[in-house]
């Protein structure tokens, strides 16, 4: 039986402090004029202000003690050393090795994984350079102007998010589209705007057997052959991110144009592996290496900084505090940047696929809450959609606000700047969420008595503010690594395996089992009357 975190002295102390903290307000806590300075930290190009969170010095001390009593130091080192911390699959967890500098080595299971990483990176760099320079030509001799990434889950969400986030760095005239859904509308909507002669497809599937990805890949292949009139065109317009050379070759892709990655990289942690090939094609090798540098800077902060100053550790501990003591179930991520409009969707897989678990590493039931629901939209759009619930609803929703000092583009707003207007909203929201507005303050403004309670803003809504000078490749890498490490720390505290995803597997198996009945090849007999009736209705109305 695993050690139970709820039996530790730190957890017991936090339980008592939670009770004593009830009724404490952020207004009271900010009577300490040094609070913002004490609870603001710099990490890998990010400025992180934790001062608008619901904690005092004693709670912070206990949270740090909780991390220590959970054995976090040893678990961090075990991950970075390549120990098999993914115990249910007996694998190392080494996404951090994807951004090791070329001069370092890391031997795991008798293999220098750093050398392997840089061998693939070198091939990616050569390929992206050929593509961007025009040395790589399509079947008819045209240069490539459009890259279409076909993948799903981690083979889609990461590169799609990052390519949009770093659109300002797309300087070679190559743009990217992303197809993930097996719904044919996804593929059709992309194909209808493509010029086959100048399009390259990147098929991202480690095993080259992923059902949705292969369905889309074959649809793209058939379209290309129809457009260009020859199966020989496939090798000039398709490359693979995979390790299955046999299936890649059978598809028609030259195995020399196959870029591999390893079983110690989970899909949701793979954007900085060969899965990022489409991103490298768009932004170029130099900026892709800067992207990796941002990851590495956050890795070093996480590995070597004391827990009391360690941003991923502190943010993870706060999430445990809200989940297990305040009963919070969701966590909002609110980037005030349209370029980060896909960041919350990316984090949904990273966080919920990792920590959506109900048993501990030894298979025993958890004794805590686990796995917050992550969600969000860019500001200021969210302000006109769901902020009402965060401000005045009955649910506690911790939120991360992400903003930048300098935009990549700006426009005037009268005599002012649109970016300044955006950030004025950013700062106003965290202020109002923290401090609210009392009935007395509203009454002093002459508001009708019957409206006062409707206008009261209770405040005490916790937020974390994350700022950077601008959204660069390095900053994006640091931001992604920040949340990767938050997920890891949460998993250590809850004693769950953050690196498997057994909950995804059964649904895929059932879909394969039901496919013949859904397509009408066999009689419907799913084993339950509801599913049978639904499939029959579908077949009748097909």
Swiss-Prot record:
InterPro entries: G6P_Isomerase (IPR001672), G6P_Isomerase_C (IPR023096), Phosphoglucose_isomerase_CS (IPR018189), SIS_dom_sf (IPR046348), SIS_PGI_1 (IPR035476), SIS_PGI_2 (IPR035482)
GO biological process: gluconeogenesis; glucose 6-phosphate metabolic process; glycolytic process
Cell compartment(s), UniProt: Cytoplasm
Purpose of the protein: Catalyzes the reversible isomerization of glucose-6-phosphate to fructose-6-phosphate.
Annotated catalytic residues: 353 (proton donor), 384, 508
Organism: Corynebacterium efficiens (strain DSM 44549 / YS-314 / AJ 12310 / JCM 11189 / NBRC 100395)
Enzyme Commission number(s) of this protein: 5.3.1.9
GO MF terms held by the record: carbohydrate derivative binding; glucose-6-phosphate isomerase activity; monosaccharide binding
Pathway(s): Carbohydrate biosynthesis; gluconeogenesis; Carbohydrate degradation; glycolysis; D-glyceraldehyde 3-phosphate and glycerone phosphate from D-glucose: step 2/4
Catalysed transformations (reactions): alpha-D-glucose 6-phosphate = beta-D-fructose 6-phosphate
A Pfam family of this chain: PGI
Alphabetical keyword list: Cytoplasm, Gluconeogenesis, Glycolysis, Isomerase
Gene that encodes it: pgi
Family according to the record: Belongs to the GPI family.
CC terms in the record's Gene Ontology section: cytosol
Protein name, entry field: Glucose-6-phosphate isomerase
Entry superkingdom: Bacteria
Signal sequence segment: none
């Amino acid at each position: 039986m695993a050690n139970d975190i709820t039996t530790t002295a730190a957890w017991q102390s936090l339980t008592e402090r939670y009770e004593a903290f009830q009724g404490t307000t952020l207004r009271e806590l900010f009577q300490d004029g040094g609070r913002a300075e004490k609870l603001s930290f710099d990490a890998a190009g990010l400025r992180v202000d934790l001062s608008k969170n619901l904690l005092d010095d004693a709670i912070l001390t206990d949270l740090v003690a909780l991390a220590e009593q959970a054995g976090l130091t040893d678990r961090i080192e075990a991950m970075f050393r390549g120990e098999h911390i993914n115990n249910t699959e007996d694998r190392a967890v080494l996404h951090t090795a994807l951004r090791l500098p070329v001069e370092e080595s890391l031997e795991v299971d008798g293999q220098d994984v750093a050398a392997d990483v840089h061998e693939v990176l070198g091939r990616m760099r050569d390929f992206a350079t050929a593509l961007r320079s025009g040395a790589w030509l399509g079947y008819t001799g045209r240069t490539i102007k459009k890259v279409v990434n076909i993948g799903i889950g981690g083979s889609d969400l990461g590169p799609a998010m990052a390519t949009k986030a770093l659109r300002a760095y797309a300087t070679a005239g190559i743009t990217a589209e992303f197809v993930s859904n097996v719904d044919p509308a996804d593929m059709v909507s992309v194909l209808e705007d493509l010029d086959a002669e100048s399009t390259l497809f990147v098929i991202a599937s480690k095993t080259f057997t992923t059902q949705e990805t292969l369905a889309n890949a074959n649809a793209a292949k058939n379209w290309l052959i129809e457009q260009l009139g020859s199966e020989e065109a496939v090798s000039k317009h398709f490359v693979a991110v995979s390790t299955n050379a046999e299936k890649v070759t059978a598809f028609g892709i030259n195995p020399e144009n196959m870029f591999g990655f390893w079983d110690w990289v989970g899909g949701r942690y793979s954007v900085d592996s060969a899965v990022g090939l489409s991103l490298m094609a768009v932004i170029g090798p130099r900026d892709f290496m800067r992207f990796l540098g941002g990851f590495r800077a956050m890795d070093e902060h996480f590995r070597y900084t004391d827990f009391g100053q360690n941003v991923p550790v502190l943010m993870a501990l706060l999430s445990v505090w809200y989940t297990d003591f305040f009963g919070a179930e969701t966590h909002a991520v609110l980037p005030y940047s349209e370029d980060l409009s896909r960041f919350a969707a990316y984090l949904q897989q990273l966080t919920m696929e990792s920590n959506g678990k109900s048993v501990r590493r030894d298979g025993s039931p958890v004794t805590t809450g686990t796995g917050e629901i992550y969600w969000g939209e860019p500001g200021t759009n969210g302000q006109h959609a769901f902020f009402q619930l965060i401000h005045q609803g009955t649910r506690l929703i911790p939120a991360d606000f992400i903003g930048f000092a300098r935009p990549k583009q700006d426009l005037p707003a009268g005599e002012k700047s649109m970016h300044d207007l955006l950030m004025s909203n950013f700062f106003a929201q965290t202020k109002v969420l923290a401090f609210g507005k009392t009935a007395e303050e509203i009454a002093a403004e002459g508001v009708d008595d019957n409206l006062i309670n409707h206008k009261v803003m209770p405040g005490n809504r916790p937020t974390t503010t994350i700022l950077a000078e601008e959204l660069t490749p390095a900053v994006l890498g640091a931001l992604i690594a920040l949340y990767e490490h938050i997920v890891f720390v949460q998993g250590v505290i809850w004693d769950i395996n953050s690196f498997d995803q057994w909950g995804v597997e059964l649904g895929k198996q059932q879909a394969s089992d039901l496919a013949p009945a859904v397509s009408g090849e066999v009689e419907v007999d799913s084993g339950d009357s509801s599913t049978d009736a639904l499939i029959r209705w579908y077949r009748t109305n097909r």
